[in-house]
């Protein structure tokens, strides 16, 4: 019979996703068949599986930690906000519809038996499932139809551990408030608490731990120190912690336009971990500066984000930068914005039906009802092998003054040839639909060398950090961190359904 544990949090960005990933790697290293599971994820960071299914990147990250291929069953429901009131609802990798919050709140009850069936199929194939909740289980206005926190735990009779972020302050209030807002039967399901992102001497924390255990009768089974691990951040809340300041000592200054509806910002994690590279996120004109490369990322609402560039003055700044031989790369929605205009006659993305683009590429995009979701492999115009994935509802047509960026050779593992993207005549403007393009180390190394040559500097002096190898190292560090700072004997008892009691044992931080 499968063992299971559910990690819930006192709030978004408490560290649920990372702890789930760490536990997946920890159990994998013990020889267990383990998979992650999150019934419903709301995110604009998504991934395309080998079968062409769309799922949240957090569960991809966790699957990698577990040593298994991403499987859409690990995240059956994905909500991708299109605006402040509506989301695209994706079930088992395919679009169902666009819904507002009220409509979805009513609709999601119909998904319960399907979610249960999906979960059971994973349970039949594995030794352990590590579940993740969303936000907080104490969203009392939504709990009557919850399918992702205590509602999910009840569906599969999973014990729950609550994670609280001490780094933001107010950790004991957040623990106590969350537990007190739970129903009695939900509190009975809560078996332990983990305090996350702790800095300092744990002895100073001990009186608070003892008091919160006495108040709640729930044991604190771990205190995780703040660790500067280089892991992907999937939650949009983490964008607030991104760098916005130039590191003047770096060899290259890469500026990413932080669009209001930015999607797949995980594309840029690989840039952030390279030595001597400054990556900063630009929200306004004052921060533009004089970068060596400007990247326009993907967007869930490309027309509205194009309007943002116009209103903020960034459109003109990017155009002036390009006219002065600046290098600009657009990914997915960013590629569409580089063109002359975008058409949305069926209002697939927004209420706008047409908007002018940046005019830096001789291209035009029309939005269609059908979404393209594929994994691809191909070769760039410079003969660099690349792989990645596409997620878009736009179809872009190139004009005479551009050439393709890439020749696609395989789609979802099947041989298929077509052209992707566009490059300007002077080669300074590049647009592509390929997410994960910078994860290709040959392409990235050549890009760095090109940018340094333009500055009359020698080639990039460091070996490009390869993402897959880097991730494996970080997953092992994360697993070791959790094993050293969680009472694993207590956690394993919880997973086996055994009762544990509040302990007087003092936790000791181990870096």
Swiss-Prot record:
UniProt-listed PROSITE patterns: GATASE_COBBQ (PS51274)
Taxon lineage: Bacteria, Bacillati, Bacillota, Bacilli, Bacillales
Taxonomic source organism: Listeria innocua serovar 6a (strain ATCC BAA-680 / CLIP 11262)
Family (UniProt): Belongs to the CobB/CobQ family. CobQ subfamily.
Pathway terms, separated by semicolons: Cofactor biosynthesis; adenosylcobalamin biosynthesis
Family annotation (InterPro entries): Class_I_gatase-like (IPR029062), CobQ/CobB/MinD/ParA_Nub-bd_dom (IPR002586), CobQ_GATase1 (IPR033949), CobQ_N (IPR047045), CobQ_synth (IPR004459), GATase_3 (IPR011698), P-loop_NTPase (IPR027417)
Record domain GATase cobBQ-type: where: 251-443
SUPFAM superfamilies, alphabetized: Class I glutamine amidotransferase-like, P-loop containing nucleoside triphosphate hydrolases
Function field: Catalyzes amidations at positions B, D, E, and G on adenosylcobyrinic A,C-diamide. NH(2) groups are provided by glutamine, and one molecule of ATP is hydrogenolyzed for each amidation.
GO molecular-function terms, A-Z: ABC-type vitamin B12 transporter activity; catalytic activity
GO biological process: cobalamin biosynthetic process
Keywords (A to Z) from UniProt: Cobalamin biosynthesis, Glutamine amidotransferase
Protein name listed in UniProt: Cobyric acid synthase
Any Pfam family: GATase_3
Cross-referenced Gene3D superfamilies: 3.40.50.880, P-loop containing nucleotide triphosphate hydrolases
Active site positions: 332 (nucleophile), 435
Top-level taxonomic group: Bacteria
The encoding gene: cobQ
